[in-house]
Amino acid sequence: MSGVWGAGGPRCQEALAVLASLCRARPPPLGLDVETCRSFELQPPERSPSAAGAGTSVSLLAVVVIVCGVALVAVFLFLFWKLCWMPWRNKEASSPSSANPPLEALQSPSFRGNMADKLKDPSTLGFLEAAVKISHTSPDIPAEVQMSVKEHIMRHTRLQRQTTEPASSTRHTSFKRHLPRQMHVSSVDYGNELPPAAEQPTSIGRIKPELYKQKSVDGEDAKSEATKSCGKINFSLRYDYETETLIVRILKAFDLPAKDFCGSSDPYVKIYLLPDRKCKLQTRVHRKTLNPTFDENFHFPVPYEELADRKLHLSVFDFDRFSRHDMIGEVILDNLFEASDLSRETSIWKDIQYATSESVDLGEIMFSLCYLPTAGRLTLTVIKCRNLKAMDITGYSDPYVKVSLLCDGRRLKKKKTTIKKNTLNPVYNEAIIFDIPPENMDQVSLLISVMDYDRVGHNEIIGVCRVGITAEGLGRDHWNEMLAYPRKPIAHWHSLVEVKKSFKEGNPRL
């Protein structure tokens, strides 16, 4: 019988299940044998399809319930550990009864006295400094402890502060005049509880004061280097009236500085008759010598009437075959009639002035000054300019003159002339008037700037000159002559120079 139950496929199983259900019915249907129905009633439970399906469903349900229960228990334990156990442990670790006394105890006089005794111990200084650093981010430390620790650290550092006196300078002295309007540095209030202690200069400032004066020494060295002599040069001048030619004879140079590694130089000389730089003449190169003898003649065709407006420019160079030639120095002879009338040859010795590049002739400007003391009126008349530097690609400039009234390095007023187009020798004859009381004449100066007008872009400065008590050279002499002869126009030619960086920064001197 077991073979009968196990034989067949799914359809046989379904047929057997239908027969079994019919046999279990009461009464059995007609046509069914009683023995056959009894055998179906005695069928093993595991062979019954319905019983097997019911057992499988119960097992799966039990497994699902167990898994869900375990997951819920795990979630509950995790939440309990996160919400209850961790805060309780941190609170117990960070809040012992003896770590932080109550605020009332910190504010008591006995606690402050004990804290002051502990602060006197130098061994606790490192710990206190660390506490001050931590107090900025630690809200648990009381504010009273932070303030007392900071006061002790400040008092201790003031006693150990090193004081040195920096080198005085004119720039700082001039700044002190404007200091009271801003703040009094020496009168800063450090609080009533911390009186300023007497500061004693340390041994560093006494032993090596030159360390603090190094900046001023460097400035003096740079100034002396700019004015030092680089040897001497000997030349002669003579004018040939028949051919209207100026004859310049370069004779020799003496005591030139060494520019090569071997301790010598390869000098030669360039000659210009300014303002014409297109005509450039040059001597031969003399190898490995610091005292060359040139003995060469150079001819410049120029009318005798123009000699007063010409300048002789000599530039001494060191020849270098494989790189740029080094400039040794230069000599500029402003007055060709300085030694004689050029009717006969005259020998001239000049010091070679230190220079790193050839000087550029920017031109000259002629103006007159006239002061009326009774009216307090200063009149500057711009007459003309000559030989201005070409600023445009056309070889010309569009010059105009700007006059600025300065007082203690500050510009009070400025006025301009008209613009002259496409010329290097403009003529203006325009008067510029400033109202200046007589008592203020020693405090003001005039800055005359020759500008090149550009339709597109910024206007460029061709050159400047300055007149006033604080000016130098001809600018000061012209100003003093105007004051000596009031109500009389005093006219002079002034050479234009480049705007120096020191003047841009507010230095009243050019």
Curated annotation (Swiss-Prot):
Q: Give the InterPro entries listed for this entry.
A: C2_dom, C2_domain_sf, Synaptotagmin
- Per UniProt, Ca(2+) 2 binds at 260, 318, 320, 326
Domain C2 spans what residues? 229-350, 361-494
Keyword annotations: Calcium, Cell membrane, Cytoplasm, Cytoplasmic vesicle, Disulfide bond, Membrane, Metal-binding, Phosphoprotein, Repeat, Synapse, Transmembrane, Transmembrane helix
Where in the sequence is Phosphoserine found? Answer: 216
Membrane-spanning intervals of the chain: 60-80
- Which sites bind Ca(2+) 1? 260, 266, 318-320
Q: Which residues lie on this side of the membrane: Cytoplasmic?
A: 81-510
Outline the segment boundaries, as ranges, of region: Cysteine motif.
Answer: 12-38
Q: Does the keyword Phosphoprotein apply?
A: yes
Q: Where is the composition biased (Polar residues)?
A: 160-172
A molecular function (GO) held by this record is: metal ion binding
Membrane topology according to the record:
Single-pass membrane protein
Q: Which cofactor is recorded for it?
A: Ca(2+)
Instruction: Detail which positions bind Ca(2+) 3.
Output: 320, 323, 326
Q: Name one GO cellular component term.
A: exocytic vesicle
Q: Which residues bind Ca(2+) 4?
A: 392, 398, 452, 454
Vesicular topological domain residue ranges: 1-59
- Enumerate the subcellular locations listed in this protein's record, separating them with semicolons: Cytoplasmic vesicle, Secretory vesicle, Synaptic vesicle membrane
**Which Pfam families does this entry report, sorted A to Z?**
C2
- Purpose: May be involved in Ca(2+)-dependent exocytosis of secretory vesicles through Ca(2+) and phospholipid binding to the C2 domain or may serve as Ca(2+) sensors in the process of vesicular trafficking and exocytosis. May mediate Ca(2+)-regulation of exocytosis in acrosomal reaction in sperm.
Q: What is known of its domains?
A: The cysteine motif mediates homo- or heterodimer formation via formation of disulfide bonds.
Subunit structure and binding partners = Isoform 1: Homodimer; disulfide-linked via the cysteine motif. Isoform 1: Can also form heterodimers with SYT3, SYT7, SYT9 and SYT10. Isoform 1: Interacts with STX1A, STX1B and STX2; the interaction is Ca(2+)-dependent. Isoform 2: Is not able to form homodimer and heterodimers.
The family line of this record is: Belongs to the synaptotagmin family.
Question: What is the protein's name according to its record?
Answer: Synaptotagmin-6
Q: What is the lineage of its organism?
A: Eukaryota, Metazoa, Chordata, Craniata, Vertebrata
